[in-house]
A protein has these predicted regions:
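GST-like domain detector, emphasizing the conserved glutathione-binding G-site
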Residues: 1-112
Length: 112
């Protein structure tokens, strides 16, 4: 595989990763996932890729699998070396950013 694949669904937890990929100009194939609550086969298929069976899942070009939007967000920032979305380690803004990132994934995403 030469490009990343993002397993996604509109209105689910993949939005932050999609926005970040677009902002950084990174190429990723979007793989639309059916409603995991209504389609047991879709959940089983996703669980073959990522045992948690949650969206988002990012498949890296070398085949490694990433899940958890916060982890993907930090990885993409590290990969690009840019700090315009994610403050670099040691930056004064980093603690506040991390607090809001974790708040988003722990408190807001579960509501969707």
């Amino acid at each position: 595989m030469s490009r990343m694949q993002l397993y996604r669904r509109n209105g689910w937890g993949s939005a932050i990763v999609e926005a970040q990929l677009a902002h950084y100009g990174l190429d990723a194939e979007g793989v639309e996932v059916a409603d995991l609550f209504l389609d047991p086969a879709a959940r089983r298929e996703l669980m073959r890729i990522s045992p948690a069976g949650q969206i988002p899942v990012l498949i890296l070009p070398d085949g490694r699998v990433m899940s958890e939007s916060a982890a993907i967000t930090l990885y993409l920032a590290d990969m690009t070396g840019r700090d315009d979305l994610v403050p670099e380690a040691g930056a004064a803004e980093r603690p506040r950013f991390l607090r809001w990132l974790i708040f988003l994934v722990a408190q807001v995403h579960p509501c969707f």
